[in-house]
C-alpha cells in the first residue's frame, strides 16, 4: 500500500497551557484529497488543561482514516483577547512513519502506537502538534499563526457566544485566572533540547526497571530497562516530572515521584 493511502485508527484533540485558555473558532485537520476524511474542531469549549495535556477527544468518522495533510485553525487567546489564524502543511510522511513504528508500551506489555493527533495552542500564535498514544507523546511540528479580526459574525453561528460583551472577562474570572503579563516565547524555550539522562542510584541488589517522564515541551517518555534509550544520554527537552520504579531484593516494587522546580532546572542547564 502506498504511503498516501495508508490508514490508521486516530482521533483528534486540543491542548493549551494552564492559565492561558484558548478556544477554537474554526478548525480542521484536512485530508490529502477530497475523498480522504477531514476532522473538524466543532463546539470544543475552552481548553487550558496544561501544555501537552488533552482537552477531551472527538471519536468520529470511520474506524481507520488516512493521516491528514494540513491544519487550518482559527482560535481565541483569552489572556491576549486576540484571535489567531493559520493554515499549515503537516509533516505527513513523518507522522505516518511514527504511526507505523509505534513503541513498546510497558503499561500493557506489548507494542502500541499513537492514537491521537493533539493540536496545542499557546499565546503569541504558537501552534504545536503532538502524537499521543498510551503513555508516550512526541512533538511532530511547530507552526506560527498570525493575528486576525473576525467580523460579520452571524448570531446563528454556533460559536456566537465568543463575541458577546464581557465573554473573555467572564471566562478568566470563572477560572480564577489573573491578568498578569504573558511570557511570550516561553513555549519555545520549553522546546530547547539538552543532552541528559535520568539516573537513579540504588544499593546493591536493587533493580531499577522503569522511568516515566513528562517534559516541559509537552512530550512524554516511557522507558523500561530493555529499551535502547534506557539510561543513555539523549537530546531532549527538560523534565517537569519523573516517575522511577524499582524492585528491592525481596521482590517488592517501589516507586518515587519527582517534581522539578522550573526555574531551578532551567537555570542549571542554561548556565
Mark where each language-model region is:
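Sec-type signal peptide cleavage vicinity
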Residues: 1-43, 64-65, 70, 191-216
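Compositionally biased low-complexity segments at domain edges in trafficked proteins
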Residues: 98-187, 271
Amino acid at each position: 500500500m502506498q504511503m498516501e493511502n495508508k490508514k490508521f485508527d486516530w482521533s483528534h484533540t486540543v491542548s493549551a497551557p494552564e492559565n492561558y485558555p484558548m478556544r477554537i473558532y474554526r478548525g480542521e485537520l484536512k485530508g490529502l484529497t477530497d475523498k480522504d476524511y477531514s476532522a473538524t474542531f466543532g463546539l470544543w469549549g475552552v481548553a487550558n488543561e496544561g501544555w501537552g495535556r488533552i482537552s477531551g477527544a472527538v471519536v468520529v468518522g470511520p474506524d481507520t482514516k488516512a493521516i491528514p495533510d494540513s491544519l487550518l485553525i482559527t482560535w481565541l487567546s483569552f489572556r491576549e483577547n486576540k484571535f489567531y489564524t493559520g493554515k499549515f502543511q503537516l509533516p505527513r510522511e513523518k507522522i505516518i512513519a511514527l504511526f507505523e513504528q509505534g513503541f513498546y508500551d510497558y503499561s500493557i506489555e506489548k507494542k502500541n502506537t499513537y492514537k491521537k493527533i493533539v493540536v496545542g495552542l499557546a499565546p503569541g500564535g504558537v501552534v504545536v502538534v503532538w502524537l499521543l498514544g498510551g503513555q508516550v507523546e512526541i512533538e511532530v511540528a511547530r507552526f506560527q499563526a498570525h493575528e486576525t479580526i473576525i467580523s460579520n459574525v452571524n448570531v446563528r453561528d454556533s460559536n456566537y457566544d465568543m463575541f458577546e460583551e464581557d465573554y473573555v472577562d467572564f471566562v478568566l474570572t470563572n477560572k480564577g485566572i489573573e491578568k498578569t503579563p504573558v511570557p511570550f516565547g516561553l513555549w519555545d524555550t520549553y522546546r530547547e533540547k539538552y543532552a541528559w539522562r535520568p539516573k537513579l542510584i540504588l544499593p546493591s541488589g536493587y533493580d531499577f526497571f522503569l522511568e516515566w517522564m513528562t517534559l516541559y515541551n509537552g512530550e512524554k517518555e516511557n522507558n523500561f530497562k530493555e529499551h535502547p534509550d534506557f539510561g543513555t544520554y539523549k537530546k531532549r527537552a527538560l523534565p517537569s516530572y519523573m516517575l522511577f520504579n524499582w524492585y528491592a531484593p525481596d521482590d517488592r516494587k517501589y516507586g518515587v515521584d519527582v517534581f522539578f522546580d522550573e526555574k531551578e532546572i532551567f537555570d542549571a542547564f542554561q548556565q
